[in-house]
Amino acid sequence: MRLLIPILIFALITTAVTWFYGRDDPDRWSVGGVWPLPKKIVYGSKNRTITYDKIGIDLGDKKDCDILLSMADNYMNKWLFPFPVEMKTGGTEDFIITVTVKDECPSGPPVHGASEEYLLRVSLTEAVINAQTVWGALRAMESLSHLVFYDHKSQEYQIRTVEIFDKPRFPVRGIMIDSSRHFLSVNVIKRQLEIMSMNKLNVLHWHLVDSESFPYTSVKFPELHGVGAYSPRHVYSREDIADVIAFARLRGIRVIPEFDLPGHTSSWRGRKGFLTECFDEKGVETFLPNLVDPMNEANFDFISEFLEEVTETFPDQFLHLGGDEVSDYIVECWERNKKIRKFMEEKGFGNDTVLLENYFFEKLYKIVENLKLKRKPIFWQEVFDNNIPDPNAVIHIWKGNTHEEIYEQVKNITSQNFPVIVSACWYLNYIKYGADWRDEIRGTAPSNSRYYYCDPTNFNGTVAQKELVWGGIAAIWGELVDNTNIEARLWPRASAAAERLWSPAEKTQRAEDAWPRMHELRCRLVSRGYRIQPNNNPDYCPFEFDEPPATKTEL
């Protein structure tokens, strides 16, 4: 009876903790759980012990493919055995991961709609990956790494046996970073690309420039970054950009640049005559104009030449040209500008600044159409809401205070046969105390929480409309985000969007079912050396994150 009393007391305490936090014990997580959840997964009943000296990867006839060689190096030397434990050797038979890819090794980055489908079978003797493309093989290898866990009782690495068939639900699954409000170093961007690949995300939307700064280095127009960058150190050279694109390619990620026009352009002031003069209500000229001058015909020649350079720098077939929040600056920069008003009268626009916007956008559409390296434009949704959109455009949705309002936006735009990308569900720069990936957080717009539950096709529309939903991009705007906090603020909150955009909707209805796998994902990424914040109330990881020793930045 004496032994029974402490056991009962412990049970009561455990129950109280569970009730207090509304969760099970903080050490509840999956073992060898795959994130995002595969389309079909069947686990075996036994696990296999693996050691780093007895495991190998056979790339078959693709042994010279740089993408697969990089993959093999990363997983063999880092990601398969991430935990800080003494590595055992010997004692097991060789375990070979055989990778078979049908298509040839591509020389460039992935293209929109490229297959990421794969088959993965792990037995007690081997692992076999089959994929149409190298991109599918990358996704399969990441899933395989999720099957590996450290058994604390036996002090061994083990891998779960499994059969997986998997492919993404949407072709566009991304992260948007903002390097204008706060400059993000190339190394920090690369770290986010690595974590993106570990969540099977495939698009980096790079919001390069905005009103605050112009860190993009233009060879043809050096006055842009010369005047618009925060300092000569806060710029991305052509080599930096090529480095990011190459790094992303090896991880199956496309890089889509954004150059927002005609608003958010104060940092373009190095180009004389590019911006309109803006005035306050007393008619006094303001210090920082923020709209392109549509009267100056030379500005369109400049935009054409500048975008030609951009397309030579960024190989992706899409080009994001912004178009948002023009109305924020219209009164100050167009309506109060006497020259603009006279120009509008001459063009027959009267006082309708929407017609002036359309005039600008129609010229921009023609510029894009005539680019030597063809690109499909992406615009923020105001270009659809307020203007005459380019019939070839993709519309990027960022508005809506509730999931229902967002769904209505998607329904409206797809009804006009425009493809859409949704970001409104996942504005991760908004933070509030609580587990916002799953719960509705008071004090924020409802759309700025419950990230796991926002489904871009959850509207009453036709099959054709829902096929026009290309996916989503989780956005982290940079007003209060820089190198020091972007990683923890993004992850694992962006992982909720990653599963929503990859996994079957019918299998991912409850965050309650997902959180043990997300907890294992968080701890896995922490062990890999990333700053992944807690996401499920008080808990712990077997191996906690530890900051490396500080070093003095070279001046």
From Swiss-Prot:
Keywords: Glycoprotein, Glycosidase, Hydrolase, Lysosome, Signal. Residues 1-18 form the signal peptide. It is an enzyme of class 3 (hydrolase). It holds the Pfam family Glycohydro_20b2. It is found in: Lysosome. The active site is at E325. It comes from Caenorhabditis elegans. It catalyses: Hydrolysis of terminal non-reducing N-acetyl-D-hexosamine residues in N-acetyl-beta-D-hexosaminides. One of its GO terms (cellular component) is lysosome. InterPro entries: Beta_hexosaminidase_sua/sub, Glyco_hydro_20_cat, Glycoside_hydrolase_SF, Hex-like_dom2, HEX_eukaryotic_N. This is Beta-hexosaminidase A. The gene is hex-1. Disruption phenotype: Worms show reduced degradation of p-nitrophenyl-beta-N-acetylglucosaminide and no chitotriosidase activity. Belongs to the glycosyl hydrolase 20 family. Its EC number is 3.2.1.52. GO terms for biological process: carbohydrate metabolic process; glycosaminoglycan metabolic process; N-glycan processing.
